[in-house]
């Protein structure tokens, strides 16, 4: 796997840069992603009228996949870094984890799916994520009932 050092952490294919994440937080790009949901990501990527078309296409692709794997994340329109999405537990799997207690430590937090569901059964959930960009995802996390 190709790896190169960035100012923040390690960058590898499939990872999202901090700059891309910040772009996805802007109202203009969030609105564009919302307008493109349901379209073919390949068509979006090739559409020269769409600013940041490749980035928008990637988010539309992963939001479409999130409808079944991470429905709360889809509804909240969370930003989904591709590699983190691929490595994430599904909400259905996370909801079935049966442990409970006072405190739990999630050393590979990623998108926080397991932590989100563990928070229903533990008084305190501590999460660690080595990819700084993925850790930004917690700014857009959904809430679950």
Question: Language-model segments: what does each one mean?
Answer:
Residues 124-129:
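Conserved SAM-binding motif I beta-strand of class I
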Residues 1-11:
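N-terminal amphipathic/basic-hydrophobic helices that include classical n-h-c signal peptides
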Residues 103-108:
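Conserved class I S-adenosyl-L-methionine
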Residues 11-101:
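S-adenosyl-L-methionine
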Residues 65, 110-111:
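Short glycine-enriched loops at secondary-structure junctions
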Residues 111-122:
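Conserved SAM-binding loop of SAM-dependent methyltransferases across substrates and taxa
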Residues 137-143:
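Conserved small/polar residues in nucleotide/adenosyl-binding loops
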